[in-house]
């Protein structure tokens, strides 16, 4: 019986390329959104609705955690799941610290080279360069973060909690989701958040609120979505979803065309604002759900285009989300200082934007090729104990995808 259970746990997990596709698209959007006043950024989601790539990444991460580790925990291998998820959290922590050091060095070097201290202030590294002895400790504690480095601490927190979330979802899925919703409401009501640096500030992504998206996604991943599938894709639900998407589009257009704001009743403006990203405003949450309903309707799992050469570049980026995200942070700042120091013309904006995406694709291709090269240090004989064997199961590499502001 143990051998049978172990074999079931080690069975290959069929990859859903849609998740890689949307993560890849999200990585491109993050890169473009981080370039101030970039004309190409008008292609990104945040300009046409309440949600953006952040919701996509957190949902995909939570869904994969539930989908991959739900059967593992249900099979009695909780410690194996905990070990792998905590190891992944440690990898992300190391990646965050390395990204922090290199990104800060890039900003400092650029500021010195062009004698332009604006970069140090704009990206919140001036205090670090002035007092590195104090702020390096704050950075290690995930309190001090330069601009655009807020997301990995959120993921680290969620992944550390993921084994216990999955354990609860496997046993009491609806009760766990209800507890998550209660924590979300209490956090918003009493302003619960994690302290940041300088004193008096808090995390840009409030984990007590963003956990709702993660837990809901994991709830779907452990199989609960199948119980409401008919309701989710009913005509009524899809009609409400498209109406909500249209409403969000109209509201967001008032941000870009101020003349349209006069068409929105004052009581409605008072009711919906502010649309808070830090605490995951419910308008953002529901907008993402409405979008997800229609996207999954038009892009089924067996969509043939997922296997075409045209979508291969963006899928490759999605399959290597952590390193590509880190690379995108450097590239977006590089594009920013190029446009700031030299020119902000439309053609130059197009050039740096597409050059950055091409570099991201190239890096993803190299990472993919590197994974296909046989290791020079393969153990010829290896007898795996059950818990070690679980470690050899398909890794949730996609379960940890970064997002952005």
Q: How does the language model describe each region?
A:
Residues 1-405:
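Alpha-helical transmembrane segments and their immediate juxtamembrane cytosolic regions
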């Amino acid at each position: 019986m143990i051998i049978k259970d172990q074999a079931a746990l080690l069975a290959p997990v069929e990859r859903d390329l849609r998740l890689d596709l949307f993560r890849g698209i999200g990585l491109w959007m993050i890169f473009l959104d981080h370039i101030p006043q970039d004309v190409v950024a008008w292609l990104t989601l945040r300009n046409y609705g309440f949600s953006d790539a952040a919701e996509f990444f957190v949902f995909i991460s939570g869904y994969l955690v539930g989908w991959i580790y739900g059967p593992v925990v249900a099979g009695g291998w909780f410690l194996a799941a905990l070990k792998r998820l905590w190891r992944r959290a440690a990898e992300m922590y190391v990646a965050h610290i390395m990204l922090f050091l290199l990104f800060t060095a890039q900003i400092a070097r650029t500021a010195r080279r062009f004698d332009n201290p604006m970069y140090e202030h704009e990206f919140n590294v001036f205090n670090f360069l002035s007092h590195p002895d104090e702020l390096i400790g704050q950075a290690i504690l995930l309190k001090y973060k330069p601009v655009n480095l807020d997301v990995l601490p959120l993921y680290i927190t969620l992944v550390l909690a993921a084994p216990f979330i999955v354990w609860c979802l496997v046993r009491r899925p609806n009760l766990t989701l209800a507890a998550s919703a209660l924590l979300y409401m209490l956090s918003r009501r009493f302003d619960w958040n994690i302290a940041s640096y300088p004193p008096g500030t808090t995390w840009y992504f409030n984990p007590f609120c963003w956990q709702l998206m993660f837990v809901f996604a994991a709830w779907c991943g452990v199989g609960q979505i199948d119980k409401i599938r008919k309701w989710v894709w009913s005509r009524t639900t899809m009609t409400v979803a498209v109406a909500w998407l249209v409403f969000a589009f109209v509201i967001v257009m008032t941000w870009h065309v101020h003349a349209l704001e006069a068409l929105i009743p004052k009581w409605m403006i008072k009711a919906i604002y502010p649309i808070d990203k830090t605490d995951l405003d419910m308008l953002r949450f529901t907008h993402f759900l409405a979008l997800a309903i229609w996207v999954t309707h038009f892009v089924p799992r067996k969509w043939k285009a997922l296997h075409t050469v045209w979508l291969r570049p963006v899928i490759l980026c999605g399959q290597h989300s952590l390193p590509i995200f880190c690379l995108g942070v450097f590239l977006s700042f590089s594009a920013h200082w190029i446009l700031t120091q030299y020119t902000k013309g439309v053609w130059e904006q197009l050039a740096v934007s597409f050059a950055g995406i091409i570099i991201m694709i190239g890096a993803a291709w190299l990472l993919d090729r590197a994974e296909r090269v046989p290791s020079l240090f393969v153990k010829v004989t290896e007898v795996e104990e059950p818990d070690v064997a679980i470690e050899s199961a398909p890794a949730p590499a996609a379960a940890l995808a970064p997002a952005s502001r």
